[in-house]
């Protein structure tokens, strides 16, 4: 099965559909996005479709193949045509975090430090502080970084 995202005027994913492979292959049996898009346009009347892969997540293909467009989208995600990726705008945890266009994940402006063994033993971990735009070492049971 091939998967295609139905794209709205603001590049928001309206829906994701599965398409039988027979509807998106050429005469040599090679899957082509353009054939799938044409099939969907003719059969739905909607003109904006972008192929996606159910096997791609965070910029990695589960089967070791070439990842397709960052991550498999859901309704409400955004298709970034400049970077050719899908991303979840609602997954952005803090305003200062930026979109990694290789993985389609939101990342902090500075990497999260690794706790030392002593810090972990003391029940400490790093948590993002948006006000200071920095990682802070905090204490507490069951706390975790963002």
What are these regions (language model features)?
Residues 2-146:
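Viral virion structural and adsorption modules
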């Amino acid at each position: 099965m091939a998967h295609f995202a139905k794209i709205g005027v603001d590049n928001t994913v309206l829906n994701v559909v599965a398409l039988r492979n027979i509807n998106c292959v050429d005469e040599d049996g090679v899957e082509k996005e353009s054939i799938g898009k044409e099939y969907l346009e003719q059969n739905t009347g909607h003109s904006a479709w972008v192929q996606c892969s159910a096997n791609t997540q965070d910029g990695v293909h589960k089967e070791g193949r070439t990842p397709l467009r960052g991550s498999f989208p859901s309704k409400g995600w955004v298709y970034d045509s400049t970077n050719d990726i899908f991303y979840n705008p609602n997954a952005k945890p803090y305003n200062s975090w930026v979109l990694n266009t290789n993985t389609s994940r939101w990342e902090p402006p500075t990497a999260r430090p690794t706790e030392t063994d002593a810090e972990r033993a003391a029940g400490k971990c790093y948590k993002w502080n948006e006000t200071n735009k920095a990682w802070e070492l905090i204490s507490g049971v069951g706390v975790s970084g963002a």
